[in-house]
């Protein structure tokens, strides 16, 4: 059983570090519940500290 490739409410997004620009994390987001872009404080392994990560598209 494969996943459907339609336009569902849940989408896969990447979290991009604001200081380095590297995509460190991937997560899912429900578009019906959250319309604005996701912003989280996450650990950046390059800088070895917690930085702001914003939602970006997965290539």
UniProtKB/Swiss-Prot annotation:
Q: What would be an example GO MF term here?
A: structural constituent of ribosome
Q: What is this protein called?
A: Large ribosomal subunit protein bL33
Q: Which GO cellular component terms are attached? A: cytoplasm; ribonucleoprotein complex; ribosome
Q: Which PROSITE patterns match?
A: RIBOSOMAL_L33
- Annotated keywords: Ribonucleoprotein, Ribosomal protein
Q: Which GO terms describe its biological process?
A: translation
Q: Which family does the UniProt entry place this protein in?
A: Belongs to the bacterial ribosomal protein bL33 family.
Q: Name one Pfam family in it.
A: Ribosomal_L33
């Amino acid at each position: 059983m494969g996943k459907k490739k339609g336009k569902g409410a849940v989408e896969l997004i990447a979290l991009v570090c604001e200081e380095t620009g590297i995509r460190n994390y991937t997560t899912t987001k429900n578009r019906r519940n959250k319309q604005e872009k996701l912003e989280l404080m996450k650990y950046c392994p390059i800088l070895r500290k917690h930085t702001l990560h914003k939602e970006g598209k997965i290539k």
